[in-house]
Regions:
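Alpha-helical transmembrane segments of multi-pass membrane proteins
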Residues: 1-13, 205, 215-240, 255, ...
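Membrane-interface junctions at transmembrane-helix termini in multi-pass inner-membrane proteins
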Residues: 9-31, 229-259, 274
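Hydrophobic alpha-helical transmembrane segments
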Residues: 31-46, 53-82, 259-263, 277-298, ...
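Alpha-helical transmembrane segments of multi-pass membrane transport and lipid-handling proteins
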Residues: 46, 182-233, 265-266
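Interhelical loop/hinge segments that connect adjacent transmembrane helices in multipass membrane
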Residues: 54, 58-62, 77-109, 176-179, ...
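Helix-terminus/linker motif at the lipid-water interface of multi-pass membrane proteins
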Residues: 109, 113-154, 171, 211-215, ...
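Helix-loop junctions and terminal segments of transmembrane helices
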Residues: 152-177
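Membrane-proximal transmembrane or re-entrant/amphipathic helices at the cytosolic face
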Residues: 328-377
Length: 377
């Protein structure tokens, strides 16, 4: 009940945020979001400090959320009207809006439901495979609470890239600027591959150490090291889904999502007996590979201008292997002569620099791309 008023504030703010995004006004978009988060944290800390019970603390946190949503709603409304925004009759836009929004809404809603199903199935299948209840829950906690956040690092950069490229992609598509659209798609795909291929070797070489340093958990580190290669298909799947959604293929990406979700559920059901807790990660990777392949196929099929990305992607993927070997050698060298923390920092810095030089030498990256990525992210 406490959170119900926040639904109104957040719904209206989401519309204004969408308008800011579509009009490429990224600075107010980001500033208002940042202020909302800061208000939520500050008010939450202030209110929780006086709680008398767990239930009272939960209520106070809910009030902090409502307050932060009210702040973002107020700031966005002020900005909207100060910049000349006006209210209009939405009925003429209802049909195209629903046609575009329903598939994406279906994906988001279904994703939450599927995650709920997985959270019920996975422990049961792990226990059936021979784990105790405590071991199963501990393993799930390590994967979902420790390893996956680290493996999601590329998603931050790619999400920022998608945020600023989607309006440009949509504009070029609906104006029929197919040449510029092709260039946008190629640039997005190549930058995504470079980001993933730059991070994978670092996680492979330093994954076990990161698990110890960040969470004091060796199993977390082993999972990061063994599963870091899934970042390439997951990153490409993420950016290609954003590309297709921006040019009117929301129904297709929704269908691909359900195919990938089916693969995830199958892995979650059948694989725990063979690979234990890694079944969840295998399901995520399988879903990403399927979505990635289907998305790329649709992009190639529907593009008026031929999109060239396969050679660049394959060479990027192959380039990961020698850099991983270099990272492992550097890590072993530095760990033998200095404490773990400085060894990890030094290895990571040298490895990222060497990887960047290697990619530039192979002609896979251009200096202007690095500037573009930093500017847009």
């Amino acid at each position: 009940m406490i959170l119900l008023p926040a639904l109104t504030f957040n719904s209206v703010y989401s519309v204004i945020r969408g308008a800011l995004w579509g009009n490429k006004k990224f600075v107010p978009y980001c500033v208002i979001d940042l202020v909302e988060e800061l208000c939520m944290i500050a008010m939450g800390v202030f209110l929780v400090s006086g709680m008398t019970s767990v239930f009272d603390g939960a209520k106070r946190i809910a009030f902090a959320i409502v307050f932060s949503y009210l702040v973002s709603f107020t700031l966005s409304m002020i900005y909207f009207f100060v910049k000349g925004g006006k209210l209009a009759d939405p009925r003429a836009q209802m049909k195209p809006l629903l046609a575009s929004a329903l598939p994406i809404t279906g994906m988001r809603t279904s994703s939450s439901l599927i995650n709920t199903v997985i959270s019920l199935i996975l422990p049961a299948r792990l226990i059936a495979a021979g784990m105790s209840s405590a071991e199963a829950m501990s393993g799930i906690g390590v994967v979902m609470g420790m390893s996956m956040p680290v493996l999601s690092i590329p998603a931050t950069l790619i999400g920022s890239l998608a945020l600023v490229m989607v309006p440009e992609l949509a504009e070029n598509f609906y104006r029929g600027n197919h040449r510029q659209l092709k260039d946008n798609i190629e640039k997005a795909l190549k930058l995504t591959c470079l980001v993933a291929c730059a991070i994978i070797p670092a996680l492979f070489a330093l994954g076990e150490d990161l698990g110890v340093l960040l969470f004091d958990n060796e199993e977390c580190g082993r999972i990061i090291k063994r599963c870091c290669f899934m970042l390439l298909p997951t990153s490409i799947s993420m950016i290609t889904t954003s590309i297709l959604n921006s040019v009117g293929y929301e129904k297709q990406t929704c269908g691909y999502f359900f195919i990938g979700a089916a693969a995830t559920l199958l892995c979650t059901w059948f694989l725990p007996a063979y690979i234990g807790i890694y079944a969840q990660i295998a399901g995520t990777a399988a879903s990403a590979v399927i979505s990635c392949a289907l998305n790329l196929r649709l992009i190639v099929k529907k593009s008026k201008e031929k999109v060239r990305f396969l050679k660049h992607t394959l060479i990027c993927a192959v380039s990961i292997l020698p850099v991983c070997l270099l990272g492992a050698l550097l890590r072993n060298l530095f760990v033998s002569v200095m404490p773990l923390f400085p060894a990890v920092i030094l290895t990571g810095a040298i490895l990222l620099a060497a990887d960047a030089l290697f990619l530039f030498a192979l002609g896979l990256a251009e200096p202007k791309w690095a500037k573009l990525l930093v500017k847009r992210s």
